[in-house]
From Swiss-Prot:
SMART domains the UniProt entry points to: Ribosomal_S15 (SM01387)
One GO CC term on file: cytosolic small ribosomal subunit
Stored Pfam families: Ribosomal_S15
InterPro entries, A to Z: Ribosomal_uS15 (IPR000589), Ribosomal_uS15_bac-type (IPR005290), uS15_NS1_RNA-bd_sf (IPR009068)
Protein name as it appears in the record: Small ribosomal subunit protein uS15
Keywords from the named record: Ribonucleoprotein, Ribosomal protein, RNA-binding, rRNA-binding
Domain of life according to the entry: Bacteria
MF terms in GO: rRNA binding; structural constituent of ribosome
Amino acid sequence: MALTNADRAEIIAKFARAENDTGSPEVQVALLTAQINDLQGHFKAHKHDHHSRRGLIRMVNQRRKLLDYLNGKDHERYTALIGALGLRR
């Protein structure tokens, strides 16, 4: 099931660097991670949904690009974000 507006607002409030911050890499990565985790359950029930799997791979690649950018820009923020989201890298 897709993220609700309340879920999005909660994630944005948790990872925002300033009020009304929706564009920082931390917020974008957190939202992508929530969407990716949501799709994991979908694929357990629908193994042959290749069209949606392509969208999942695109989201994972976008998250990786944002994480690489953040790692090069500010390594401390990167490690804090990885720890907060429970991602391995």
